[in-house]
Amino acid sequence: GPERAEAAIGLRHAVRVLCARNQTSIGRQHAANRDHRMRKLMNAKVWLVGAGPGDPELLTLKAVRALGEAAVVLIDDLVNPAVLEHCPQARRISVGKRGGCRSTPQDFIHRLMLRYARQGRCVVRLKGGDPSIFGRGGEEAWWLRTRGVEVEVVNGITAGLAGATQCNIPLTLRGVSRGVTLVTAHTQDDSSLNWRALAEGGTTLVIYMGVAKLAEIRQRLLEAGMAGDMPVAMIENASLPQQRECRSALSQMSDDAQVFALKSPAILVIGRVVAAAQVVELVAMASA
C-alpha cells in the first residue's frame, strides 16, 4: 500500500545520502593521500656528505648533524666504520666503489637515492674525503637536481690535504710552491692529462689513485720535463693509525714504492715542499 511505497522511497533516499557521504569521504581521503605524496616529493632531499680521509675526528660538525638526522645512509667503500656511530638510527646500505674490485653500479646508486628521497626520508650519501674531489659528487648532484630533488653538499677534508699535514708537508709554502694541483691517475683516457702543464706548473702536485700507475706517472712527468730529483712523498692510509709514508724522488719512486710495498689507498705528493718539510724536521730534531 501507500505506506510501503513511502517507506521504500525513504530507504532509497537514505541509501543515496549514505553513498554520497561515503564518496565524499573517499574523495577527501584520496585528496589527502595525494597531498601527502606531493609534500613528500616537494620535500625530497639528499645530503652529499664528506666523511673525510679516515680519522673520524676530522668529521665536520655539519656532517655529524646530517648523519644524526638521517633515515637512510648510502655508504662508500672508503668510509671509516667508526663514522657510522653518528647514525645508529639509520638504515645503512653499502654502495662501495673501488678500482679493481667489484663495485656498485652508479646508475643503481642514483635510483636508490631518488627512491628514498621521494619517500620523504632524510637521505645521506656518505663519501670518503670530499664529495666534490674525485667523489662523483658533482655528477650525483646534477642527476638528482634534474629530477626535482634538493641536494645539499657537506664538505669533507680530502685525503691529499690530511695526508700531507700528517707528514708535516705544507702543500703551499711561500717562495717554494705557489699553488696545489689535484689530479686523479684513475682515468678512462690517460692522454687527457696535460703532463707538460703538470710538470712545469710550479705547483705542488697531489695525485690520487696512482699506486697502480706509478711507473707510468714517473715516465710521463720525466718526459714532460720534470726534474728527476723532484721530491716525492707516497702516503698510505692518510690520517689513520696505520698511515705509512715513503719519501723518494721522482726518478726512483717506482722502485722505492715496490720495496716499501705501497698499497692503496694512497696519495702521491710531488714537489719541493716535500724537501722543505724534511729540512724543517731536521732543524726541529737538531734543536730538541
Whereabouts are the PLM-identified features?
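Short hydrophobic/aromatic-enriched beta-strand-loop microsegments
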Residues: 91-97, 148-152, 171-178, 225-234
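Intrinsic-disorder-associated, low-complexity terminal segments enriched in Asp/Asn/His/Tyr and depleted
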Residues: 22, 33-36
